[in-house]
């Protein structure tokens, strides 16, 4: 019985801990309202530095940024990396993302 308990405890602590995943739409609010990835938060590129800590307080969480074509999301990725976010992905343009979308 004791060995089974130790084995179960060892398994729990050996499982990887996954950080949360956040989708950030860096387009202007009007574009976000027309269509966006389901669950995404709208933080326009020019506001990323000021607002990201509220939306994503843990810098080890996965942050996926997107825009219309990938240029602004590339800039956002650079900004977030410079701010210490460790898992930032440029997801490119909205049309290229294979995730459920919400249309306004």
Curated annotation (Swiss-Prot):
Site (May be important for providing the necessary conformational flexibility for enzymatic catalysis) location in chain: 93
Induction trigger: By heat, ethanol, osmotic shock and infection by filamentous bacteriophages. Expression is positively regulated by cyclic AMP-cAMP receptor protein (cAMP-CRP). Expressed at higher levels during growth on glycerol, acetate or proline as carbon source relative to expression during growth on glucose.
Active site: 67 (cysteine persulfide intermediate)
Cellular component annotations (GO), alphabetically ordered: outer membrane-bounded periplasmic space; periplasmic space
Reaction(s) the record says it catalyses: thiosulfate + hydrogen cyanide = thiocyanate + sulfite + 2 H(+)
Signal peptide range: 1-19
Subcellular location: Periplasm
Pfam families, sorted: Rhodanese
More about this protein: Catalysis proceeds by a classical ping-pong bi-bi reaction mechanism, whereby a covalent enzyme-sulfur intermediate is formed on the active site cysteine.
General function of this protein: The phage shock protein (psp) operon (pspABCDE) may play a significant role in the competition for survival under nutrient- or energy-limited conditions. PspE catalyzes the sulfur-transfer reaction from thiosulfate to cyanide, to form sulfite and thiocyanate. Also able to use dithiol (dithiothreitol) as an alternate sulfur acceptor. Also possesses a very low mercaptopyruvate sulfurtransferase activity.
Protein's recorded name: Thiosulfate sulfurtransferase PspE
Lineage: Bacteria, Pseudomonadati, Pseudomonadota, Gammaproteobacteria, Enterobacterales
Gene: pspE
């Amino acid at each position: 019985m004791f060995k089974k308990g130790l084995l179960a405890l060892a398994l729990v602590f050996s499982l990887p801990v996954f950080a949360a995943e956040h989708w950030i739409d860096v387009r202007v609010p009007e574009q976000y309202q027309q269509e966006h990835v389901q669950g995404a938060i709208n933080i326009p590129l020019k506001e990323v530095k000021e607002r990201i800590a509220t939306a994503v307080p843990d810098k080890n969480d996965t942050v996926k940024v997107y825009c219309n074509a990938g240029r602004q999301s590339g800039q956002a990725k650079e900004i977030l990396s410079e701010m210490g976010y460790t898992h930032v992905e440029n997801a490119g343009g909205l049309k290229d993302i294979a995730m459920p979308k919400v249309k306004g």
